[in-house]
Amino acid sequence: MRQTFKLERAEARLMAAAAITKAEEIKVFETVCIADDGGHPILIERMDGARITGPQIAWNKAFTAAGHKRSTHLFNQTPNGPALPGNEAFGIQWSFEGRFAVFVGGFPIVVDGEVVGGIGLSGGNGEQDTTCGVAALKALQEYFGSKHRVLVQADIKL
């Protein structure tokens, strides 16, 4: 048997707060979804003024990042993104009843080398969503200190 880390509400709240604080700093209205390792939401928070479509899009991004263990923008990154036309996963975005997100804003949450969830952001442009997502990952690392290692970067692929 192997011991694993389970992402809980306390960590999800901390991450969402960090993402929203960063969104306020850069003046963008974000929706944040923190999902568990199965892609199920632990927390969804939509800032006042954020789009009404944000919660579903953020959840889709968190679901994809957690389930496929990679940042969502990597699916369409040239030249070898697997979801690009002619590549092995072209059309994957239509799977899971259209919930598979292949654009920027979803990041796996990796603790001690294990994917424990995903974070999805919707509301900004790609750079803004990424900035807020990385801020959330950084906040989780700061929370754990030296007890656990969180992968804090935009390009994550396990």
Model-derived features with residue positions:
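Flexible, solvent-exposed loop/hinge segments and secondary-structure transition points
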Residues: 1-158
